[in-house]
Amino acid sequence: MRVFAGLILALAASAAGAAHEPWATIRFPQDEDKWWWDADWWERGRIATPANHAVRARTASYRNGEVEIPVEIFSAGKFPVVVFLHGRRGLDELTRLVPLRLAARGFTVVAPDLFSGRLIDKMPVRHDPVLEDDAALAIDFALALPEAGSQAKTCVVSHTRGGYYALKALVTKGRQAKTACYISYYPHWQHPEAPEAMQVYQYAPEVDELRVPVLVFLGEHEQYQRVRPILAGIDSLKAKKRDARVIVYPGVGRGFDFRPPEVRTLADDLAAQDSLARAARFIAGLIKQ
């Protein structure tokens, strides 16, 4: 009888232990309502096959007054037009792969080089407001391309400070009427020259004015002064009943979409490939050509 009672106690203890929360955080904002749930995969084992197209790149430009803004256009044919806005790093051998990979999913991606036309070195600390106009004009330029056809709206994809350029282009420069969605990787959702307390505890007021669907990606180990404004901004948009979503990828930090091979991790690649597939589906569901 004692042996039996001891066995019962041991089983009860093991069950209770199994129910304990793990020591590491495994639940993130996207797990609250599980909007990402895929019943087709869970119940029938089906995984969506991503589109894969050979991409060609060509150069072009558009003007803002006397300044010519160079553009790289990544295209695999007559596909819907999307705009990509780079961040502080500019467009280089690593970051240009981001719009290229998006184009391979079946889009024509317009990637303006906002820095070189204005002789701005990469990694600028200060924010030049004229770049907001240049970013807004990229949307106009994209929708005027032959590939756009009768497409009335585009989606704007960005990363890091490009997320701020996109925010200002849509809200301050009035391009929301031409925009079907805002997608950004760890965007800088605050004026780059705002005081430290505002960088950490507040998001830019323009975030509350976003009316288009929003999708944001960031890593678990992103810098805190980016994480807090992003999550607060998403919460505010959701409270206003706007379509706003965020995914926090476990085990990665900033730059997971373009970190070079010598420092790249498997977690970086998993996050980059998953976010790319989700961004492509998000765009495809919102823009019509």
Predicted features by range, described:
Residues 126-146:
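Alpha/beta-hydrolase active-site loop
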Residues 90-99, 228-229:
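The serine-hydrolase catalytic nucleophile loop
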Residues 79-87:
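Short beta-strand element of the alpha/beta-hydrolase
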